[in-house]
């Protein structure tokens, strides 16, 4: 099940995230209705029988289940609303979905997303979830556009999505922080930007902090006033379940996910969100979701004993002494340095003239947030693109560390600490290692189980 830091995911926002990924492995740049009627798999012969109408989610009445299945083959998102003809056959998809959402919103436990429709019945270009403050751009069919969600402000959705070519000039300033996206990719693959799913927006704002960051912020903000020892504590599934049940009792409208536990404090390999019908695979020891495993109304096939890889034994920096740093202060120092780097990366991306002459390129979507920070700063320091930071390039690094990180005593020999093999240069793996950045869950090398102390540095910056 999702760990505590992401269990506040509201049901309909989870659905929004799923819609951001192409369904069923199809990689199309246009609506599914463009599939030809001559396509045999989607054109089964429907025998003439007594009509048994079905009202579907596109607002149309289908005369039989066979005709409905034919339409669903072309549009996998199509669903049955009720048996019988639609009450208003001329009702648009947006108005139908809005009516359904308003009906569901009457239930006190649901924080429902209600779509906004134009005078002609089409979806308005900007849609918002009033309960969380998130807004995003949608296609004419109402599908959320990857990379467009913002919180507490209106996204810039300029013109029809398919009318605007992909711009190259601003590519260095646009970053899609799509950490959560691959979790809900139905075919397990990474999201593929297309003309439909990756539009270009005017303005200088960073595109799409995902709801993954939103819930990291919620979780990490709760750790702000706790000491480092408490923030490192690994909670068992039983503890997380009790905490979730208590939060669900206090906040029944938030759609909180309740983890299912196995003996010994472990998580069951399959976790589900009952309100939405979504299930996914997790690591049984941490509850961390596995990307690409989310399904709806179908139980995913999960490994029964998938566990987090132990990096502590392979981390040469874990017990490495930082000369001059007071005992027990290394973690605090590295946390403050990483937070400062994160802040500067966001400001650089969001500025009209990024540092380094616009050298920041679209990051690898498989990277964690802290990996992206490490890669970004390494590219700033490596001015000659030699894939290492030499003695000359190390000077601004030393000045930065002394200025930004605390306690100051830990900064004096930090570059020596990073130079693991003592060859007088710092490689990218060495920089990531001394910053405690690891593939699994962000900062694991220096921060046990990936839990960093203090406030998440993206509060107020990415959302």
From Swiss-Prot:
Binding site for Ca(2+) 1: 382, 384, 386, 388, 393
Entry comment on modification after translation: Glycosylated.
Subcellular location field: Secreted, Extracellular space, Extracellular matrix, Basement membrane
Keywords: Basement membrane, Calcium, Developmental protein, Differentiation, Disulfide bond, Extracellular matrix, Glycoprotein, Metal-binding, Repeat, Secreted, Signal
InterPro entries: Dev_reg/Prot_inhib, EF-hand-dom_pair, EF_Hand_1_Ca_BS, Kazal_dom, Kazal_dom_sf, SMOC1_EC, SPARC/Testican_Ca-bd-dom, Thyroglobulin_1
Residues that coordinate or bind Ca(2+) 2: 419, 421, 423, 430
Phenotype upon gene inactivation: Null mice present with a phenotype resembling human microphthalmia with limb anomalies. The phenotype includes aplasia or hypoplasia of optic nerves, hypoplastic fibula and bowed tibia, and syndactyly in limbs. A thinned and irregular ganglion cell layer and atrophy of the anteroventral part of the retina is observed.
Functional summary from the UniProt entry: Probable regulator of osteoblast differentiation. Plays essential roles in both eye and limb development.
Name used for this protein in its record: SPARC-related modular calcium-binding protein 1
Native source species: Mus musculus (Mouse)
Gene: Smoc1
């Amino acid at each position: 099940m999702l760990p505590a830091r992401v269990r506040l995911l509201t049901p309909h926002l989870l659905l929004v995230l799923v819609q951001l990924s192409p369904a069923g492995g199809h990689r199309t740049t246009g609506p599914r209705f463009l599939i030809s009627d001559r396509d045999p798999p989607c054109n089964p012969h429907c025998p003439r029988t007594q009509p048994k109408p079905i009202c579907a989610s596109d607002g149309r009445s289908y005369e039989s289940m066979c005709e409905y299945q034919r339409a669903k083959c072309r549009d996998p998102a199509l669903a049955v609303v009720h048996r019988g003809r639609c009450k208003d056959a001329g009702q648009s998809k947006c108005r139908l979905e809005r009516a359904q959402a308003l009906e569901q919103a009457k239930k006190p436990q649901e924080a429902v997303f209600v779509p906004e429709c134009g005078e002609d019945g089409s979806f308005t270009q900007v849609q918002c979830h009033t309960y969380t403050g998130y807004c995003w751009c949608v296609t004419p069919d109402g599908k959320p556009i990857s990379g467009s969600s913002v919180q507490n402000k209106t996204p810039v959705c300029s013109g029809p999505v398919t009318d605007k070519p992909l711009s190259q000039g601003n590519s260095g300033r646009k970053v899609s922080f799509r950490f959560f996206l691959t979790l809900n990719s139905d075919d397990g693959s990474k999201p593929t930007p297309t003309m439909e799913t990756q539009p270009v927006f005017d303005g200088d704002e960073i595109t799409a902090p995902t709801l993954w960051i939103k819930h990291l912020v919620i979780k990490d903000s709760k750790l702000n006033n706790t000491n480092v020892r408490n923030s490192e504590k690994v909670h068992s599934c039983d503890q997380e379940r009790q905490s979730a049940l208590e939060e669900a009792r206090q906040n029944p409208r938030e759609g909180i996910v309740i983890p299912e536990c196995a003996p010994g404090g472990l998580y069951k390999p399959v976790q589900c969100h009952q309100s939405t019908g979504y299930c996914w695979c997790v690591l049984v020891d941490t509850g961390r979701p596995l990307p690409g495993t989310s399904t709806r109304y179908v139980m995913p096939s999960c490994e029964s004993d998938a566990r987090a890889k132990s990096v502590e034994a392979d981390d040469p920096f874990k017990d490495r002494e930082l000369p001059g740093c007071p005992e027990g202060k290394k973690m605090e120092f590295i946390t403050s340095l990483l937070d400062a780097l994160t802040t500067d990366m966001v400001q650089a991306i969001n500025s009209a003239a990024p540092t380094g002459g616009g050298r920041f390129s679209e990051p690898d979507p498989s990277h964690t947030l802290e990996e992206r920070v490490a890669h970004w700063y390494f590219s700033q320091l490596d001015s000659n693109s030699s894939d290492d930071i030499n003695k000359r390039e190390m000077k601004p690094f030393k000045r930065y560390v002394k200025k930004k990180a605390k306690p100051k005593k830990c900064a004096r020999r930090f570059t020596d600490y990073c130079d693991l093999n003592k060859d007088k240069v710092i490689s990218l793996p060495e920089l990531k290692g001394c910053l405690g950045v690891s593939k699994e869950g962000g900062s694991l090398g220096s921060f046990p189980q990936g839990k960093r102390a203090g406030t998440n540095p993206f509060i107020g910056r990415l959302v």
